[in-house]
From Swiss-Prot:
GO function terms (MF aspect): glycine hydroxymethyltransferase activity; pyridoxal phosphate binding
Protein name (database record): Serine hydroxymethyltransferase
Source domain of life: Bacteria
Enzyme class name: transferase
Biological role stated in the UniProt entry: Catalyzes the reversible interconversion of serine and glycine with tetrahydrofolate (THF) serving as the one-carbon carrier. This reaction serves as the major source of one-carbon groups required for the biosynthesis of purines, thymidylate, methionine, and other important biomolecules. Also exhibits THF-independent aldolase activity toward beta-hydroxyamino acids, producing glycine and aldehydes, via a retro-aldol mechanism.
InterPro entries on file: PyrdxlP-dep_Trfase (IPR015424), PyrdxlP-dep_Trfase_major (IPR015421), PyrdxlP-dep_Trfase_small (IPR015422), Ser_HO-MeTrfase (IPR001085), Ser_HO-MeTrfase-like (IPR049943), Ser_HO-MeTrfase_PLP_BS (IPR019798), SHMT-like_dom (IPR039429)
Gene that encodes it: glyA
Cross-referenced Pfam families: SHMT (PF00464)
Biological process according to GO: glycine biosynthetic process from serine; tetrahydrofolate interconversion
Family: Belongs to the SHMT family.
Enzyme Commission number, as recorded: 2.1.2.1
Organism of this sequence: Wolbachia pipientis subsp. Culex pipiens (strain wPip)
Pathway: One-carbon metabolism; tetrahydrofolate interconversion; Amino-acid biosynthesis; glycine biosynthesis; glycine from L-serine: step 1/1
UniProt keyword annotations, A-Z: Amino-acid biosynthesis, Cytoplasm, One-carbon metabolism, Pyridoxal phosphate, Transferase
Cellular localization per UniProt: Cytoplasm
């Protein structure tokens, strides 16, 4: 072995020459993203600036603790980066305190639980079946194992959040924590009403805005900052940053508890390269262009929902106020799993999703979830989403008529044509 080959940081040690297998897989994934329509509601396309920060030399730095209070030396520059991320996040959501270290939205929620609850305490969250998230008290999740989880649902006629049920369950069970948020709910959430209910029973209110955070930052969706005791979010999805989590609050005492819960409670060293990418994304979200983008995200979702309705598809709640569009396939007697597989073969990626009070298993489902954030980033406009709705309908009709292979091939050609007009990276 030569001296040069022993030095892993030499200038010739790029990914392609070092590990061609991983390099080729990444290149194939890039080609997939370029040639397919990404309609998964939790996905987006991060900017090159965000990805450059995430792939930076900050990967090498260990920095247990918080700015100015690290357990390692040599942290003066990563302190600068983390402070920038905190300052920008607080400005973005009009809050006083923030922790940008959680590795994910799930860990951000776990930090809240660790700071406010003890095992056996009662929590109240939206049922997974009705659009909630695993960390909101679902049985398979630790939040459903460590705590007494009470689940609220949606109205069986409108599929809107049943706030009267939320209040009834809160008064009956006296939860210590109420969670307002969702992973598959397309409409506005009444955070003010949630806080009123929390006040009646002396509960903390957690607003999990993982899906809506970018829209909230841009003023396109109601903000919980005035009402929630604590706010958690991911930093990708509509916020268009790296994959990660954050926790925010206006209460200094709660902030101190959260700080201790994140470190040393749940995590050791923060991912400083990811925090740098978060800081970049927050700066991008503070720009006027981000407001224009977010407005288009919602407009495009409304067009997609209306166009799918025009094809006779049942849209949960009848429309959307966000980036999310939920389709109920029960009238077509189709399963979500079959439809998403056919769509993927045609170059359209989305996810199967349970619809309210679904009797199918989560691995099968009776519905589809679409999101418009990624393809709006790509540059698609209303007319393009109307065309996408037509293509989705063609796939569904192909399944009904039994000629899916031919339809998938034709749709795939159209998808590739759309993608070629809107190149990425």
């Amino acid at each position: 072995m030569t001296i040069a080959s022993e030095r892993i940081c030499n200038s010739e040690n790029n990914l392609k020459s070092c590990d061609n297998e991983v390099y080729l897989s990444i290149e194939k994934e890039l080609q997939r993203q370029r040639s397919q329509l990404q309609l998964i509601a939790s996905e987006n396309f991060a900017s090159k600036a965000v990805m450059e920060a995430q792939g930076s030399f900050l990967t090498n730095k260990y920095a247990e603790g918080y700015p100015g209070k690290r357990y390692y030396c040599g942290c003066e520059y990563v302190d600068e980066v983390e402070n920038l991320a905190i300052e920008r996040l607080c400005k973005l959501f009009n809050v006083k305190f923030a922790n940008v270290q959680p590795h994910s939205g799930s860990q951000a929620n776990q930090a809240v639980f660790a700071s406010l609850l003890t095992p056996g305490d009662t929590i109240l969250g939206l049922s997974l079946n009705c659009g909630g998230h695993l960390t909101h008290g679902a049985a398979p999740n630790l939040s459903g194992k460590w705590f007494k989880s009470i689940q609220y649902t949606v109205n069986r006629d409108t599929y809107l959040l049943d706030m009267d049920e939320v209040e009834r369950l809160a008064l009956e069970h006296k939860p210590k924590l109420i969670i307002a948020g969702a992973s598959a709910y397309p409409r506005k959430i009444d955070f003010e009403r949630f806080r009123e209910i929390a006040n009646k029973v002396g509960a903390y209110l957690l607003a999990d805005i993982a899906h809506y955070s970018g829209l909230i930052a841009a003023g396109c969706y109601p903000s919980p900052a005035e009402y929630a005791h604590i706010i958690t979010s991911t930093t990708h999805k509509t916020l268009r940053g790296p994959r990660g989590g954050v926790v925010m609050t206006n209460d200094e005492a709660l902030h101190k508890k959260i700080q201790s819960a994140v470190f040393p409670g749940l995590q050791g060293g923060p991912l400083m390269h990811v925090i740098a990418a978060k800081a970049v994304a927050f700066k991008e979200a503070l720009a006027p262009e981000f407001k224009t983008y977010s407005k288009k995200v919602v407009e495009n979702a409304k067009v997609l929902a209306q166009a799918l309705q025009g094809h006779g598809l049942n849209i949960i709640t009848g429309g959307t106020d966000s980036h999310i569009v939920l389709v109920d396939l029960r009238s077509q007697k189709l399963k979500g799993k079959d439809v998403v597989n056919s769509l993927e073969r045609a170059g359209i990626t989305c996810n199967k999703n349970s619809v309210p009070f679904d009797t199918e298993k989560p691995t099968i489902t009776s519905g589809l979830r679409f999101g418009t954030a990624a393809e709006t980033t790509r540059g698609l406009e209303k007319k393009d989403f109307k065309e996408i709705a037509d293509l989705i309908n063609e796939i569904i009709q192909g399944l009904i008529d039994g000629n899916s292979p031919d339809v998938e091939k034709a749709v795939k050609n159209k998808v590739e044509s759309i993608c070629s007009n809107f190149p990425i990276y």
